[in-house]
Amino acid sequence: MTVRGLRRIIVSVADRERALALYRDALGLTEKYGAGEMVALAVPGSGVELLLHERPPTPGLAGVAVSFLVSDVDAATAAAVEAGAQVVDAPADQPWGERQSVLTDPDGHVLCLVTPAA
């Protein structure tokens, strides 16, 4: 068996609506489907889904880091902060040729916002 690509990223969240305010409303992911405590969001330009699963924290499980390609790191970072994200590393040009910010969402998951440096 070989891996052909990334299908979905599953993230546990304490509050589904609060998570949707960030991922759907601030970052622009689109809702594909949802049932009960789960909702799947489409990541534009890929076949990847971000699956938000509302449930209590599970002790001992590691967090997930998710990296999103955006058109404007600074604007996306500002929108994410307005929706409840916390800045870990402010937007900055990186030596590998990307502009990147690192944030945590309201549940403490790490997310990176990147775009090719100008």
Task: Walk through the language-model features, giving the residues of each.
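Amphipathic alpha-helical segments
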Residues: D15-T30
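Short amphipathic alpha-helices within nucleic acid-binding modules
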Residues: L22, D74-A79
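Short hydrophobic/aromatic beta-strand element in the GNAT-like acyltransferase core
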Residues: A40, E49, S67, V88, ...
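Vicinal oxygen chelate
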Residues: M1-T2, T77, A83-A118
